[in-house]
Amino acid sequence: TRQFIFRARYVMLCTNGYSLLVEPFFKDKVIPTRGQVMVTEPLAERPMPTCGYSHYGYMYYRSTFDNRLLIGGARHLHKASENDTTEDRPNHAVQGSLDDYRARFFPDVTAPVARRWAGIMGFSADGLPIAGTLPDKPRVGFAVGFTGHGLSLGAGTAKRAVERLLNGTHAGAVDVDRFVAVVD
C-alpha cells in the first residue's frame, strides 16, 4: 500500500503477530510466534470423536469434517526457532516433531500428510489480548496479542477496542493501560 494514500478519521490495527512491523509501540507487548500444523489425507473413519490437547496445550489434534487428522503445535520443543519470528513457512524440525507425535499417539493413522503449514500468532507479554489506542495517536486503535486464541477472543476484544477508540471507554481486563504508565 505504499503506492496509495489512505485518509480516515479513525484507524484500527488488527495486526496481531505482525504488530511490531507496523508500530514500534508493540515492541515489548506482542511477541510474534510461529504456529505449525499438518493434516492427513482423508481417512476411512474418524480417528477421534473430539479435539484434544496434550503437553500442557503445546500439542493439539482434531478430526476434520472430512475425516482427516489435524495435528499442530510442538513449538515448545523448538523455542529458539518458533518464538520472536515472522517467518511463516513450516520448519522441518517442528514438522518432524508433529510426525513423531502422530506416530506415537495415533499409530493406526498411516495416511499420507496432505498439507503442512505455518502461521504467525501474536503472544502478549501477559497472555491476555490487548485493546486500546496508541498513546501518541488517539485515533489509532488496536486489538492484538491473542496468544493463540484469536478465534475465541477476537470478536470480544475487537468490540472493546472499537469502544475505546470511538468513546474512550476502558476495555477492562484487556485494556492497554496495564502496560502503559498513566499520568494524571
Regions found by a protein language model. Give the residues of each.
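Active-site proximal loops enriched in glycine and acidic residues that flank catalytic Cys/His/Asp
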Residues: 10, 15-16, 42, 73-75, ...
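Flavin-dependent oxidoreductases
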Residues: 1-69
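Short glycine-/acidic-enriched loop or helix-start segments at secondary-structure transitions
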Residues: 22-24, 81, 152-153
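Active-site lid/adjacent beta-loop-alpha segment flanking the redox-cofactor pocket in flavoenzymes
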Residues: 45-139
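Short, well-ordered loop/turn and helix-capping segments at boundaries between secondary-structure elements
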Residues: 17, 45, 119, 163, ...
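Short, hydrophobic/amphipathic alpha-helical packing segments
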Residues: 34, 95-99, 151, 155
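Structural motif
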Residues: 10, 37, 112, 139-141
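C-terminal lid/capping helical subdomain adjacent to the catalytic/cofactor pocket in oxidative enzymes
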Residues: 134-184
